[in-house]
Amino acid sequence: MQVKISDSIKYIGVDDKTIDLFESQYLVPNGISYNSYLIVDEKVAIMDTVDKRKTDEWLENLDRELNGRTPDYLVISHLEPDHASNIKVVSEKYPSMKLVGNAKTFSMLPQFFPDFDFADKTVTVKEGDELELGSHKLTFIMAPMVHWPEVMVSYESAEKVLFSADGFGTFGALDAQEDDWACEARRYYFNICGKYGVQVQNLLKKTAKLDIRKICPLHGPVLDENLGWYIGLYDIWSKYEPETDGVFIAYCSVHGNTAKAAEKLCEIIKSKTDKKVSIADLSRTDLAEDIEDAFRFSRMVVIAPSYDGGVFPIMNDFLHHLKIKGYKNRKVAMVENGSWAPSAA
């Protein structure tokens, strides 16, 4: 898909609409984009590669935008394979090209490419270091655990562009993006980065000092309007604050009786408030969307039957995911159902 950023900053990423599960667990009915960028100046810098599923298409995009030039640098924001799988391929194609990363990047790199010697190809940067490309200049900002330890973002000062790694990313291919950015961005954030709110807050504080006109993430659309709104949502999410004053009812039901109780509760709550109320049968909904809603709302009711001397397994899995993602700062009520040995609560 053609994405216009500027005359000097080119989009060379790809859409993947054949993938069914992102990270082998998140449903992506609209696919995913693997974003990659090219800065063309006196020197040329590639900003990340893409997943190995799309190597050939990415190389075609790169060759087209290079227009006969040779890249001087490959900036590695994030070593996760959906962004770094083609480091070896492009290094072999352009042997004079240098890899730009931080110390953690290069300590981890051999794990992914053990049969390739990068020793004389690396430029190690740290917080605040700059890379001059001509009229464009990149400043590197370390973002450890957003959401891997080697992650860094880059700020291009001439055009005021933040290359934000996985930050501000969304699920969905670029040609299948919904109008509601927040929906897929929220689902992406809480399931991919949600555990690392403190680290996201640290990054937001660093970037607050910058004059940012565009945000170029590694997944999802380039953001170039109303950036304060996007950043504001990230601030809310990473502080673990509710975004919506309302109630999320999450339930499981073996024979339908607990479902009746959940639906009746939903009806009663709706009759007593004008706040938003959402209900989900966890056995039949997307877990990632349920995690998203749990974090979105200010209140949650979990309703489940007893099973094998404990809570129903699907509810147990849901609660486990909330725990590891750092769920807090909400009011929660629990309802258990059990005829002869109630044990869910």
Ranges and model annotations:
Residues 2-62, 153-156, 160-164, 258:
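Conserved beta-strand hairpin/beta-sheet module of binuclear metal-dependent hydrolase folds
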Residues 4-7, 101-225:
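Metallo-beta-lactamase
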Residues 19, 224, 308-310:
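Short glycine-rich, flexible loops that bind phosphorylated cofactors or substrates
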Residues 47-49, 71-79, 99-102, 162-166, ...:
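Active-site neighborhood of phospho(di)ester-bond hydrolases with catalytic His/Asp-centered motifs
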Residues 53-100:
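Active-site metal-binding motif and surrounding structural segment of the metallo-beta-lactamase
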Residues 263-278:
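Short helix-loop-beta junction
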Residues 284-345:
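Helix-loop-strand module that forms the ligand-binding subsite of alpha/beta enzymes
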